[in-house]
Amino acid sequence: MEKYEPVREIGAGNFGVAKLMRNKETRELVAMKFIERGNRIDENVFREIVNHRSLRHPNIIRFKEVVVTGRHLAIVMEYAAGGELFERICEAGRFHEDEARYFFQQLVCGVSYCHAMQICHRDLKLENTLLDGSPAPRLKICDFGYSKSSLLHSRPKSTVGTPAYIAPEVLSRREYDGKLADVWSCGVTLYVMLVGAYPFEDPKDPKNFRKTISRIMSVQYKIPEYVHVSQPCRHLLSRIFVANPYKRISMGEIKSHPWFLKNLPRELKEEAQAVYYNRRGADHAASSASSAAAAAAFSPQSVEDIMRIVQEAQTVPKPDKPVSGYGWGTDDDDDDQQPAEEEDEEDDYDRTVREVHASVDLDMSNLQIS
């Protein structure tokens, strides 16, 4: 931690606190996610780090390293100066179709790469998509806490993800294809960008999770008359919002859909994306970059190093005197209180969804999940 200095807090959630930090030597700004040592350091945290570490793509926030302090495990990542895509939507109300397509194209390319690396995200949403600070913002997928790798883990069957974005099969509590569930979540993201509202929520009763889940299961959504959405875009949404995941459009089919291909930036075309799918090609691209910083952008830590650090963070040290702050000797007790409140709210949200799921006789027959 000695090589970083704090700049300011940039976020908080049920995980803990996120801070903007500066590398004292290089002056590079990084985002650092602090998770309190002890019971919070669980399988999800280790999975997030290992999965994130393996991903090298322009539309995915770069993982840099993980370090342990007296009180926290700190995940060091690329800093996205443009903030959340969610905030941009809130400010605009909704996007014009061309702008929505611009961000959707980047989202799909990033998720498609994750799937090629055998990782499904399982919690795709606007809040987990960041933007860099460029005039034409580059979208960056973040937060791999719920992700699963088919190379390291079994097929998912837990009900994870955010209810407004969740796919019907995820509610089945049976094994499902996480990649197909990600496709559904991408569709919800596109809809929200176009309409400025969630497709399966009743805007007059947004906290009625029972109604939301019922609408998800019956694929009950509509595009308001006052929102102009072209027919090709409507067709794509209708192919994404299909209850049976095996009849749903695939990520590859989305990438060949006429609406997706319209005004597709050169760097997102298949021939330009190919280098990221070849690990050796990606390594060569990094090592041959003119900037030394680009060559060092990927984490030097091995999986074994990360496992050792995470295991260390699962224990809470008993210092001779209290350790304050996040490892640099400042008093940040107030910062620790805010996430606890948000965590309670998040727990209530998830708990309600589970209760609704348990109390409603959901018809899963149309899903045909084996």
Swiss-Prot record:
Residues binding ATP: I10, G11, A12, G13, N14, F15, G16, V17, A18, K33
Q: Residue ranges of the Protein kinase domain? A: 4-260
Spans of biased composition, class Acidic residues? 330-349
User: What's the EC number here?
Assistant: 2.7.11.1
Q: Which SMART domains match?
A: S_TKc (SM00220)
Expression induction or repression: Weakly induced by hyperosmotic stress and abscisic acid (ABA) in leaf blades. Induced during incompatible interaction with the bacterial pathogen Xanthomonas oryzae pv. oryzicola.
Q: Name one Pfam family in it.
A: Pkinase
Transmembrane helix as a keyword of this entry, yes or no, is no
Looking up SUPFAM superfamilies in the UniProt record yields: Protein kinase-like (PK-like)
Subcellular localization is given as: Cytoplasm; Nucleus
Post-translational modification remark: May be phosphorylated.
Basic and acidic residues biased stretches: 350-360
Active site residues of this protein? D123 (proton acceptor)
Q: What is its main location?
A: cytoplasm
Region of interest: Disordered: 312-370
Described function: May play a role in signal transduction of hyperosmotic response.
Identification of the protein by name: Serine/threonine-protein kinase SAPK5
State the gene name recorded for this protein: SAPK5
